[in-house]
């Protein structure tokens, strides 16, 4: 394998890109994981479809703990934060109750957009451009 200096690599990329030939950077692909975001955030991310996404399933992954994201604006208000935590705990209590009696894909309907999720993203360099 021949090694090339960074300047030469940059020139090789800059020429076709400056001529509008962006397909050359579609061959470099990146896969990364985004962890601990809310489902509300993940839905905003995937709705634009600039990449391939695999999101943690609420159907096949047990949602045993009240694992959720609290928006900063709620966290700054002590009473609002307290009520938010109480509500999340209550939602999980009801989810656990339902998941013992109905299929998990039906029980998950009560889970909020605040649920923590993980998502794997794969995209090429052009999508990151």
Residue map of PLM features:
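Family-specific signature for flavin-dependent thymidylate synthase
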Residues: 1-129
């Amino acid at each position: 394998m021949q090694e090339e200096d960074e300047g030469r690599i940059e020139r090789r990329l800059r020429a076709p890109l400056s001529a509008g030939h962006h397909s050359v950077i579609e061959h470099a692909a990146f896969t990364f994981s985004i962890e601990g975001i809310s489902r509300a955030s993940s839905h905003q991310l995937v709705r634009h479809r600039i990449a391939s996404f695999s999101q943690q399933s609420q159907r096949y992954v047990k949602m045993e703990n009240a694992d959720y994201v609290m928006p900063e604006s709620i966290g700054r208000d002590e009473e609002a934060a307290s009520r938010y935590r109480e509500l999340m705990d209550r939602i999980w209590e009801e989810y656990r109750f339902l998941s013992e009696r109905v299929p998990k894909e039906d029980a998950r309907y009560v889970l909020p957009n605040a649920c923590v999720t993980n998502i794997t993203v794969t995209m090429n360099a052009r999508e990151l451009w």
